[in-house]
């Protein structure tokens, strides 16, 4: 009896302590001046950061982490929220989650013991897409609720779960909230903004999580895949499909064939908890499966990259805004179905309802993790160990193409059934040539090794284990030099390794057999190793050698080359290396003369057309050697001056942008800055003002800049975005007025034409290649067919459809525009523009730079009717007066991923 009283007393004291702690936690209204969810009220990031720090100071349930800088220099924060006892022991629980997540080095028995000891780790973020304002505000409210509530469910969650509340986009919240709250009249407040809500990527910041180009992506990936390895990742978004409140899991097919099945089953389990809670709380409007467009196929999203790391990724897309709105009538959403089990009726809607729904969903996820703590942790280990085992033996992933081959083998077996010797399954799924790879080797002697190092860093920043060769070695009969990288698939994150190197094999996902395709959510294929032009070898047997394991998360630098002794005639370096352009720009910025070698250096058999040459001088040597060492660029010394040479000089580069921002322009800005190209943003009003040649040598128009000509005047492709020169300036601050407007056929195109005729260079991508039709360049849309009645029409989607995929094209390396490029390269292609030349094209000096020479150019993804692409041209150079126009049908700057194509941009950026 006495012991019971003591225990009861301890529990009572603990509850009193928790209650006192909760009373000390500042409420959002005390800090912000309004309740989270109040109409017409948004918090800025400055206010949110201060509140997070107050929670950290006031509550022993909260620990704040500074996870790194944003692109605009703010600090990005994450809160760990759990019971006070767990907070005191966070490092131990982090170690348990890391160890189970990586799976190697422990036995099954040890894993079970760790799962029994550990705490489930759940990541919840908000604000990635800053105009989706529910996300940041549910994060604030969730932090407050977890730090202050003392109900039984909350205390059980805090005892069993470590909740990581991560802000995903500090800069975006500051921009959006400040813009919204600037208007004094609440009823006139709007979330429209003058520029992208992430400095470079805008909405595409949720497409960067296998490349990790952006600082915020790097910060988040480090926490997810190196520091914590949570079991659940919940990524909040907007907006829900019309006629619903929120879309969430389970998601529609297809899912990637490399996932562990426990990922998908675990996703279904969490999804059931989410839907169940909303329905039990009489909150209708949750849609799932085919009720929304979302799938689990794509890698690169904050949520989806988690699947490739054995993490259950949750996405919800919810309606709501600080400005009151409504749920409109969508009749076919009113009938209950498995996709929409509890429909919602049309009604008015306010911000508070969205916050309430979000809190319910968060608690559903956390309650699931709390109740299944042991299984969440052990399954993380089991999935990782499954990957280790699959990568350590012969294994055949069941890809759609392999199943198609199996069906063909069955048909062959039936036609020769009398032999009785056919075993189609064994023929396909035990074929040694079809085995999954066990090892990828990235040799250090490839032409552009610094770009290969960038690729390796993308792997490392996603938690992949990489080895480096400390000396020369041999594998599968081939010699490799020291410094080569070895990536084995016998590791927990094997799905991500395969996805970065191997083609994506998207199924023929049709509405019905022979019917139109169902568009993938985002891309169908993206293989980064292909897009970046990486040379690698794929081995189906394990490799041992003089290898050193790179510590998790330790990014690599290109090896500093050995610099030659002083040279009498100067120095050369390769045009095949992307980083060479960084070196060139460093030299030019210091006033040092740089030349290109149209025929290479005849005294160097390894030299190629377009290589760079710098004359000898003390200053040139100092700048060149410093920059080359920083960027991993090899330098050759010359004893005799090369000939012929062509001098290049810095150009005045203009990059089109618009009010509200352009993601394609933003990514191009990112690339220019990464490679030290100075530039100026140019907006439509400046173009319309004319006299462009006075200020600029080169103008870049990415997709969305140039409108299509009037219907019937050309074969223009793509919608463009333009044609309306004016725009209402009401509500737009004066400092942004110069950004307003659009490119028009009447005002803008004549000025661009004049710029070209006076010797300017224009580079266009995707829909902006419409400019060619405005200028009467003799090209046509190649993606048309002639019917029996002689009528020319576009292909239907059942005949031809290539969503985002990787296709191989030939490159005309004889042209200056393609100096440094290989004879073939991989393009990211998304129903992109494809051309054919008119009769007079050659006589007018129009040249093809890239084209499809085969009827099967698909390398990764999905391509219905790809045979129609044969002989289609996707990159063109055309003279216009004294200037040059470049047309790139695909986006060769796409999300700063296709490093293998960057030279097609860089070569044009000098005068």
What is the role of each PLM region?
Residues 171-174, 194-198, 212-227:
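Substrate-binding cleft of carbohydrate-active enzyme catalytic domains
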Residues 18-22:
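Sec/Tat signal peptide C-region and signal peptidase I cleavage site
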Residues 23-133, 137-161, 207-208, 213-215, ...:
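Intrinsic-disorder/low-complexity accessory segments
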Residues 190-211, 233-251, 274:
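Core alpha/beta catalytic barrel or barrel-like domain that forms the active/cofactor pocket
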Residues 8-17:
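Bacterial N-terminal signal peptides
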Residues 165-169, 180, 235-243, 768:
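Short, solvent-exposed turn/loop segments enriched in Gly/Ser/Thr/Pro and often Arg
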Residues 1-9:
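Bacterial N-terminal signal peptides that target proteins for export
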Residues 158-163, 168-207:
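Divalent-metal coordination cores built from histidine and acidic residues
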């Amino acid at each position: 009896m006495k012991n019971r009283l003591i225990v009861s007393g301890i529990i009572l004291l603990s509850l009193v302590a928790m209650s006192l702690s909760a009373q000390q936690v500042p409420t959002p209204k005390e800090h912000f001046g309004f309740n989270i969810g109040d109409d017409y009220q948004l918090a800025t990031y400055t206010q949110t950061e201060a509140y997070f720090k107050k929670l950290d100071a006031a509550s022993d349930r909260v620990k704040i982490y500074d996870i790194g800088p944003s692109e605009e220099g703010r600090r990005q924060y994450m809160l760990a929220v759990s019971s006070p006892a767990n907070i005191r022991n966070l490092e131990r629980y982090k170690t348990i989650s890391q160890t189970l997540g990586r799976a190697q080095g422990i036995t099954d028995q040890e894993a079970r013991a760790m799962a029994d000891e550990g705490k489930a780790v759940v990541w919840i973020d908000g604000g990635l897409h800053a105009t989706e304002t529910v996300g940041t505000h549910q994060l604030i409210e969730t932090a407050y609720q977890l730090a202050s509530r003392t109900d039984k469910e909350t205390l059980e969650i805090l005892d069993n779960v470590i909740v990581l509340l991560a802000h995903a986009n500090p800069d975006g919240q500051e921009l959006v909230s400040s813009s919204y709250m600037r208007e004094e009249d609440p009823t006139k407040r709007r979330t429209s903004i003058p520029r992208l809500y992430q400095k470079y990527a805008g909405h595409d910041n949720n497409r960067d999580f296998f490349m990790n180009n952006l600082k915020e992506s790097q910060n988040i990936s480090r926490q997810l895949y190196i520091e914590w390895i949570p079991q659940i990742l919940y990524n909040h978004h907007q907006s829900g499909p019309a006629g619903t409140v929120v879309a969430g899991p389970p998601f529609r097919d297809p899912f990637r064939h490399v996932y562990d099945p426990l990922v998908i089953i675990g996703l279904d389990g969490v999804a059931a908890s989410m839907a169940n809670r909303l329905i039990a709380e009489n909150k209708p409007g949750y849609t799932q499966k085919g009720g929304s467009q979302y799938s689990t196929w794509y890698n690169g999203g904050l949520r989806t990259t988690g699947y490739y790391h054995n993490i259950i990724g949750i996405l919800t897309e919810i309606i709501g805004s600080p400005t009151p709105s409504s749920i409109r009538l969508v009749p076919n959403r009113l009938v209950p179905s498995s996709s929409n089990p509890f429909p919602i009726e049309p009604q008015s809607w306010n911000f508070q309802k969205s916050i309430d729904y979000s809190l319910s969903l968060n608690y559903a996820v956390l309650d699931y993790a709390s109740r299944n703590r042991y299984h969440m942790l052990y399954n993380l280990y089991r999935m990782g160990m499954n990957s280790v085992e699959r990568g350590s033996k012969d294994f055949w992933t069941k890809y759609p193409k392999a199943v198609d081959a199996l069906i063909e083998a069955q048909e062959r077996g039936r036609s020769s059934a009398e032999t009785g010797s056919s075993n189609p399954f064994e023929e396909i799924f035990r074929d040694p040539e079809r085995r999954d790879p066990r090892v990828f080797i990235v040799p250090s002697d490839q032409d552009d090794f610094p770009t290969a190092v960038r690729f390796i860093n993308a792997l490392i920043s996603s938690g992949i284990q990489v080895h480096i060769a400390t000396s020369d070695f041999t594998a599968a009969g081939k010699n490799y030099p020291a410094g080569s990288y070895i990536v084995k698939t016998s590791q927990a994150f094997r799905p991500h390794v395969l996805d970065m190197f191997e083609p994506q094999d998207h199924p023929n996902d049709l509405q019905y057999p022979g019917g139109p395709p169902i568009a993938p959510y985002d891309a169908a294929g993206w293989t980064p190793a292909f897009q970046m032009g990486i040379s690698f070898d794929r081995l189906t047997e394990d490799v041992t050698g003089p290898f050193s394991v790179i510590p998790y998360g330790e990014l690599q630098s290109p090896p500093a080359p050995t610099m030659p002794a002083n040279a009498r005639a100067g120095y050369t370096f390769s045009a095949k290396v992307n980083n060479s352009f960084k070196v060139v720009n460093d030299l030019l910025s210091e006033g040092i003369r740089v030349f290109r070698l149209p025929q290479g250096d005849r005294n160097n058999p390894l030299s190629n057309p377009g290589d760079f040459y710098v004359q000898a001088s003390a200053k040139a040597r100092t700048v060149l050697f410093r920059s080359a060492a920083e960027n991993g660029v090899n330098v050759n010394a010359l004893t005799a001056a090369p000939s012929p040479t062509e001098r290049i000089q810095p150009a005045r580069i203009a990059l089109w942008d618009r009010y509200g921002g352009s993601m394609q322009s933003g990514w191009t800005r990112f690339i220019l800055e990464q490679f030290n190209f100075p530039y100026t943003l140019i907006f439509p009003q400046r173009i319309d003002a004319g006299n462009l040649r006075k200020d600029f040598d080169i103008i870049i128009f990415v997709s969305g800049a140039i409108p299509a000509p009037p219907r019937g005047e050309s074969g223009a492709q793509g919608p463009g975005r333009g044609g309306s020169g004016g725009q209402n300036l009401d509500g737009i601050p004066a400092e942004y007025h110069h950004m307003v407007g659009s490119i028009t056929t009447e005002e803008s195109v004549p000025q661009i034409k004049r710029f070209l005729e006076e010797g300017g260079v224009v580079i266009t991508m995707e829909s902006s290649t419409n400019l060619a039709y405005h200028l009467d360049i003799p090209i046509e849309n190649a993606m048309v067919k002639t019917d029996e009645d002689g009528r020319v029409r576009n292909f239907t989607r059942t005949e031809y459809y290539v969503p985002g995929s990787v296709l191989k094209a030939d490159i005309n390396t004889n042209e200056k525009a393609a100096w440094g490029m290989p004879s073939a390269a991989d393009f990211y292609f998304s129903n992109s523009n494809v051309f054919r030349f008119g009769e007079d094209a050659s006589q007018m000096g129009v040249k093809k730079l890239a084209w499809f020479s085969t009827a099967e150019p698909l390398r990764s993804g999905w391509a219905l009717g790809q045979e129609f692409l044969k002989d289609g041209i996707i990159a063109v150079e055309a003279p216009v007066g004294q200037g040059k126009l470049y047309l790139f049908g695909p986006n060769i700057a796409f999300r700063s991923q296709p490093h293998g194509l960057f030279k097609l941009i860089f070569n044009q950026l000098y005068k």
